[in-house]
Amino acid sequence: MDVRQSIHSAHAKTLDTQGLRNEFLVEKVFVADEYTMVYSHIDRIIVGGIMPITKTVSVGGEVGKQLGVSYFLERRELGVINIGGAGTITVDGQCYEIGHRDALYVGKGAKEVVFASIDTATPAKFYYNCAPAHTTYPTKKVTPDEVSPVTLGDNLTSNRRTINKYFVPDVLETCQLSMGLTELAPGNLWNTMPCHTHERRMEVYFYFNMDDDACVFHMMGQPQETRHIVMHNEQAVISPSWSIHSGVGTKAYTFIWGMVGENQVFDDMDHVAVKDLR
């Protein structure tokens, strides 16, 4: 488990390129036949990836010890979106088939969660966010047909994109975790511009569906003290509440966003005008 401490905005603005990457970038999300796990002190979110190829991968008691509990989800909820080939997730003996861009919400109290790929030639890639939970909501599969999509932006401003809301109150109940998948239309490069912060929630972006020769310049920092982190395919970045979170790519891309914090009101944002950015 890679533990990341919280960081003050006054400290963050003094960091060089490597310093920013050390604090906020999750460089390697998927490793064959293993789970990766980054624990952030910011709202206690855990992010990572699971890519089973030659064997199943379970997340259970061994993680619980690191969290000071008996098992991983004793006091947590889990959200998973599969960006790879078809797979399965077995939760306490109940098997769910999770296809490409299907998702699974796992409620607090699940003792054993086992991940598998159906075809080793096209393994599943399970990206997950995990947050503290105060009660148990039912485990539920969500397919792309069941999400709440919103299309925003314009080709003229190069920010036309569809926001697919997987884990939001309109789709299912969670304690605090919200997750979704945003896909840019071909030829569009910008996400979340004009940008915003949300003082009441933190967020993690996971960029994927990118060519090897492409990158995204992820914008972060306070609106008057912006910085950037160069992101490549299948990398994630942690965004504190005080930071903007926007990006521009050399080509179109897709990203998964996950939020935890005070509320689940998607539109609870502190908008920042482009003219006010520095």
Curated annotation (Swiss-Prot):
Disulfide bonds: none annotated. Pathway: Glycan metabolism; pectin degradation; 2-dehydro-3-deoxy-D-gluconate from pectin: step 4/5. Its cofactor is Zn(2+). The keyword Ribosomal protein does not apply. It is an enzyme of class 5 (isomerase). Catalyzes the isomerization of 5-dehydro-4-deoxy-D-glucuronate to 3-deoxy-D-glycero-2,5-hexodiulosonate. This is 4-deoxy-L-threo-5-hexosulose-uronate ketol-isomerase. The lineage of its organism: Bacteria, Pseudomonadati, Pseudomonadota, Gammaproteobacteria, Enterobacterales. The gene is kduI.
